[in-house]
Amino acid sequence: MIIPEHFLYVLYIVLSTTVSVCSSVYIFSIFYFGRKKERDNHSKNTGNITILIPVYNEDVGLFNRCISSVNKQSTPFIVIGNGCNLPYREIVEDNGGRFVYLRDNVGKKGAMAEGIKRVNSEYVMLLDSDTVIPKNAAKRLIQKFDTETGGVGAEIKIIKDSNKFVYYPSEMLQKLRQLSFKAMSHFGRVLVLNGQCAVYRTGLIRDFILSREFLEPRFLGKKMVIGDDILLTKHINGMGYKTILAQDVIARTKGQGSFKKLVKQSIRWSRSGYINFIKGIKDGSLFKNGFFYSFSMIYVYTLPVLTLFLMVLRGGLLFNIIVRRGILNGGRLFILSFTHIPRILNSVIFPYAGIKIISIISVVTMIYLIIEKTEKNRVRFLSYGSIILLVMFLTAIYAVMSLNNHDKWLTR
């Protein structure tokens, strides 16, 4: 069956207009809600907290920095040696912490399960062994809790690295995530509480962490590899509790050691995100966390696929014009074909152009948001950091195409 060319023009304009409108709404929402100050109505919370840290073959110097920062919190902490003992035990015990040695490497989730059994406090901070937290971070995070809050995450930044092709894209990736999460936090439902540093009510997550649903999650009939942070956040959201991002607590974490590892991390995050998105549609949780949460999820996970489809559609139209009219006139005729649209579309030419102008404004707004709090090397940050945009697009498409291959972690 031959599809009429006019129909393809209509389809292109309708879809591209829809994407432009949704992108503008998303970006302007981030600009408005993400810049609002946090509501300060629960600052008297002083509940007790334990910090739980799984460790596996971590860089000793970085682990030492992590434990030193934890020691300054003046709160109990437990480190689970996941198939590793010295020198981590010495570092932990020298700083007044408790070290639990597991002979076998049971994975991060397994180590978390062993650790949560030993936590008796009202709150628990889950902290990665390569993450450094500021003084009083634990106290400030639990002060964000009210009776309706189940989890609070810290803002994450990347520890500066000499490899600019890894550091700047990694920092850009984190910044894009934080911009979105800040806006979602305003509504009390974030997509992910960053796994590097987040605080939860112990009573809400203890049984879940010990459950098979957390330790051995399944997708498409087989065991899947998915981030513990996505599972925990989805669990808290599903219980009806708020999940929020603390904008005044900044934890710094180690980036990926090479560009190849950064790409693999992006694939893992994308694949985990799509699995969570599909499961959210299947169990209905996608539509139970408020309009902005649902809109953000649908926009973020359909955008790469729609963008690829529009690229293919536009390329097909251009190829068709070149074949019919000749390669020399192809480019000019392709442009003219969108200005001499069939009469049925005459009424949408002006609004279509107006929407494109709004889209340009929204892109400029996004760039402003990205560089707003970048104090140094803004040009370098944008130029090197923008590499991650292409990586995110390509890895998202690859993640969709390889959803069935979800049993490998890819990065450590």
Regions found by a protein language model. Name each.
Residues Y9-I13, I27, F31-R35, N41-K44, ...:
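Membrane-embedded multi-pass helical conduit in multi-pass membrane proteins
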Residues C84-L86, K288-F292, N405:
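Short, solvent-exposed helix-helix connector turns and helix-capping sites enriched
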Residues G47-G284:
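Non-transmembrane catalytic domains and loops of membrane-associated enzymes and transporters
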Residues M1-S68:
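N-proximal low-complexity "stem/linker" segments adjacent to membrane-targeting elements
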Residues F219, L286-Y299:
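Membrane-water interface at loop-to-transmembrane-helix junctions
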Residues E5, Y9, S29, Y167-K182, ...:
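Short hydrophobic helices that act as membrane-entry/anchoring signals
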Residues D407-R412:
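Short, charged juxtamembrane terminal tails flanking transmembrane helices
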Residues F259, V263, F287-F292, S383:
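Alpha-helical membrane-protein architecture signal
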